[in-house]
């Protein structure tokens, strides 16, 4: 029995599963001693042995099946991984993959293939596959270059198309300013109060600002030169001081100066203007309410010009400042006004076009620093490509010239108005051609003075003669 126990198949199976030990550990020691006692073989024991053998065979078969299924699964996983890697390699090669993977593939092909002809065929096939990719890339690059060229041409076309809108955007505020000045000058010139406000500059002349022949300073060319020289000297000094402050970055002083100047213009000139308008319209108003309105008007103007405000509010206050300044300068004598306009137009040429002119230096400094100039400048569109800037002095002197024409005859007003707009259009055309800062005063002022002279000496007498003769054209 000992030999039978040694050859007992319940000891270990082929896969190392100790089935017999697991069975024996569940039995008690008494059971083990009983089994270890010698007994005769019986058919039941043989049947039990057969059952045990069948169980062992079934377990072995199950283990073999599990191993086979595991092997099949591993082979499937390997095949799937290979397919994935091959797909990745194919996609990588189709998109212009790295040369290292291609080299490894070539080495594997060379090691597997025995003939040199097959290697040559593979190399030629790789070259033939890579050539269309290069041709496609070259074609794509050519298409991109053509599209870029088309884009540049399109930008140029758009800039030319926007030129008309740019002209309209700057002509509209200039026209509004001039028409407002003409309206208020004509309205206030018919009132006796406005004539009394001009008495401090006119001695014995008419209420139109020295157009009569008896005025002391109006017909004196020397006196007009002196007054115009004083005004021009003030303009030069303030411009040079402005450039120096901006050059040395004294921005706090510069903004304080601008705040004070705008407050003075809106406060003093606004007070005089509104008093004249209230008196002309015969509207009573107490001093407290008037002071409150002027204070709010001035503070809102400073905030609207230099602080955060809507673009239309900013533009509105710039137009109001131009109107107030032009109306206040209209009280100067006739010869003084024309002398001042000519001298300022010539100075504008020097200041903008001269290599060391103050305005040219100011523009160059702002371009170098990529900063906006803190000045009273009218902008058509902030932050846009079609942004035009026109100084507030240009608005003032345009309006001053047409206000002087309004004191003579309406025919002078229309002719001067058309001349000023024509000069402004020519200036903007030169700006589009030369693409640099240009003076806006010379062409418009000289054309305006020329048309004013022709209208005053030829057109106005002709219209008056036709009116007296009752001939209407």
From Swiss-Prot:
SMART domains to which the protein is assigned, alphabetical: PSN (SM00730)
Keywords: Endoplasmic reticulum, Glycoprotein, Golgi apparatus, Hydrolase, Membrane, Notch signaling pathway, Protease, Transmembrane, Transmembrane helix
Low complexity composition bias: residue spans: 54-72
Cell compartments where the protein resides: Endoplasmic reticulum membrane; Golgi apparatus membrane
Pfam families documented for this protein: Presenilin
Membrane topology: Multi-pass membrane protein
Glycan attachment positions: 190
Active site: 348, 394
Entry's free-text remark on domains: The PAL motif is required for normal active site conformation.
Protein name as annotated: Presenilin-B
Originating species: Dictyostelium discoideum
Protein's gene: psenB
């Amino acid at each position: 029995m000992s030999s039978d126990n040694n050859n007992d198949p319940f000891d270990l199976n082929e896969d190392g599963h100790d089935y017999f030990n697991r069975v024996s550990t569940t039995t008690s020691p008494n059971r083990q001693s009983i089994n270890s006692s010698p007994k005769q073989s019986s058919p039941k024991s043989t049947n039990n042995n057969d059952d045990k053998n069948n169980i062992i065979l079934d377990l072995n078969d199950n283990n073999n099946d599990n191993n086979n299924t595991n092997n099949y699964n591993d082979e499937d996983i390997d095949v799937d991984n290979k397919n994935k890697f091959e797909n990745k390699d194919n996609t990588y090669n189709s998109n212009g993959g790295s040369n290292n993977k291609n080299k490894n593939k070539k080495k594997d092909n060379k090691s597997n293939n025995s003939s040199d002809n097959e290697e040559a065929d593979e190399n030629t096939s790789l070259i033939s596959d890579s050539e269309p990719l290069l041709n496609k890339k070259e074609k794509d690059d050519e298409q991109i270059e053509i599209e870029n060229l088309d884009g540049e041409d399109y930008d140029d076309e758009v800039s030319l198309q926007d030129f008309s809108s740019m002209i309209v955007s700057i002509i509209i505020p200039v026209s509004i300013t001039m028409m407002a000045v003409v309206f208020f000058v004509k309205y206030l010139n018919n009132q006796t109060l406005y004539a009394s406000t001009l008495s401090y500059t006119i001695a014995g002349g008419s209420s139109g600002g020295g157009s009569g022949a008896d005025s002391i300073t109006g017909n004196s060319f020397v006196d007009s030169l002196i007054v115009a020289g004083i005004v021009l000297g003030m303009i030069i000094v303030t411009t040079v001081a402005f450039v120096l402050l901006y050059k040395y970055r004294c921005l706090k002083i510069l903004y304080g100066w601008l705040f004070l100047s705008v407050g003075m213009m809106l406060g003093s000139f606004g007070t005089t203007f509104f008093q004249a308008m209230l008196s002309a319209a015969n509207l009573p108003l107490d001093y407290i309410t008037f002071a409150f309105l002027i204070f709010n008007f001035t503070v809102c103007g400073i905030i609207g010009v230099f602080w955060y405000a809507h673009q239309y509010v900013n533009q509105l206050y710039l137009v109001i400042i131009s109107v107030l300044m032009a109306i206040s300068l209209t009280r100067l004598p006739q010869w003084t006004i024309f002398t001042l306009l000519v001298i300022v137009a010539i100075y504008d040429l020097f200041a903008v076009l001269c290599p060391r002119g103050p305005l040219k230096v100011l523009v160059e400094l702002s371009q170098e620093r990529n900063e906006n100039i803190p000045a009273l400048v009218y902008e058509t569109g902030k932050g846009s490509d079609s942004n035009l800037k026109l100084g507030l002095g240009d608005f003032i002197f345009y309006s001053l010239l047409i206000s002087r024409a309004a004191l003579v005859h309406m025919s002078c007003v229309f002719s001067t108005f058309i001349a000023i707009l024509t000069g402004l259009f020519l200036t903007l055309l030169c700006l589009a051609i030369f693409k640099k800062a240009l003076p806006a005063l010379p062409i418009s002022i000289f054309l305006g003075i020329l048309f004013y002279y022709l209208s005053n000496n030829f057109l106005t007498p002709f219209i008056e003669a036709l009116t007296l003769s009752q001939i209407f054209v």
